[in-house]
Amino acid sequence: VYFINNVTVHNNTIEIPQTVNGGYDFSHLSLKGIVIKDEDLSNSNFAGCRLQNAIFQDCNMYKTNFNFAIMEKILFDNCILDDSYFAQIKMTDGTLNSCSAMHVQFYNATMNRANIKNTFLDYSNFYMAYMAEVNLYKVIAPYINLFRADLSFSKLDLINFKHADLSRVNLNKAILQNINLIDSKLFFTRLTNTFLEMVICTDSNMANVNFNNANLNNCHFNCSVLTKAWMFNTRLYRVNFDEASVQGMGISILRGEENIPINSDTLVTLQKFFEEDCTSHTGMSQTENNTHEVAMKITADIMQHAD
């Protein structure tokens, strides 16, 4: 059953008008359970559509317009979605599998529990997108814009975010594994309560990033800017800060556990410790002249009890 301008059409087939660019105009239709395979839908218009349990497989959907569409359990499988528009969509339990979705506009999109895997997202724009509980796996996304996006409670594995903008992104309680963030921007990014494993942030700008209560395992921040970053109650294991800029950084590594997850491979180079933390653990008050001495004393104290 299709709904066109509030008129129900019960025919098995209907004639879909064409857009001015040669595509098909499905705008504002309610489509449930449709399966479209091996079709050229480039320049088509699905704006304002309601798509439930829809499947698009092996379709060319170049420059297709899905703005303001509502999608429930939709599947894009091996489709070309380059230069398409998904602005302000509301997607629930949607999947993009083995798609090319480069230069796509997802700004202000809501994508609850989306599953994006084996997909190219180069240069795509997720500005202020809400993507809670999303699952990203084997995604190539250099130069992607995720500014102010919400990826809380999400799982990201095997992602190439090289040269990406993740500034002010909310990654609270997310899981990040095998992530390439080389030469990326993470201004004011929220990584609280986050698990990070094999995350490479070499030459990245991470000023004011928040790692409070995070767990970092085998991560690299070589030559990155971590000015005024926060790392309170943070667990570090084999984390590399070689030649990183850490002016004004605040840090309080978890102590007092039987197996503190830190070892000699960890390099903690700090310019600032909070006075209370320094005094309570070293008996020394920090001054401009003894920053290095205080840092070494705290590091030695940690290593003494480390496994």
Predicted regions and their residues:
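Short, solvent-exposed mixed-charge patches
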Residues: 305-307
